[in-house]
């Protein structure tokens, strides 16, 4: 799997997870934002690691 497939699969999984939640409150919103931020940081770390390997 390349990085584009992983990114699209992760975005799809986040969409399904948010659509499945029935009652949405502030805690869920904060958790979603933290999860997106962590995913973004990990994605950049992975891209940096790959670029240093080459």
Curated annotation (Swiss-Prot):
For membrane topology, the record states: Single-pass type I membrane protein
> Does the UniProt entry include the keyword Flavoprotein?
no
Cytoplasmic face residues: 51-54
Give the highest taxon in the source lineage. Eukaryota
Q: Which UniProt keywords apply?
A: Membrane, Signal, Transmembrane, Transmembrane helix
Query: Can you tell me where the transmembrane regions are?
Result: 30-50
Might you report a single GO cellular component term? Answer: membrane
Tell me the protein's name: Uncharacterized transmembrane protein DDB_G0282757
Instruction: Write out the topological domains of type Extracellular.
Output: 22-29
- Its main localization is membrane
Q: Which residues form the signal peptide?
A: 1-21
Q: Where is this chain's protein located in or outside the cell?
A: Membrane
């Amino acid at each position: 799997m390349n990085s584009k497939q992983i990114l699209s699969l992760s975005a799809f999984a986040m969409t399904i997870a948010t659509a499945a939640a029935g009652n949405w409150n502030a805690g869920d919103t904060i958790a979603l934002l933290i999860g997106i931020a962590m995913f973004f940081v990990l994605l950049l770390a992975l891209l940096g690691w790959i670029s240093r390997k080459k």
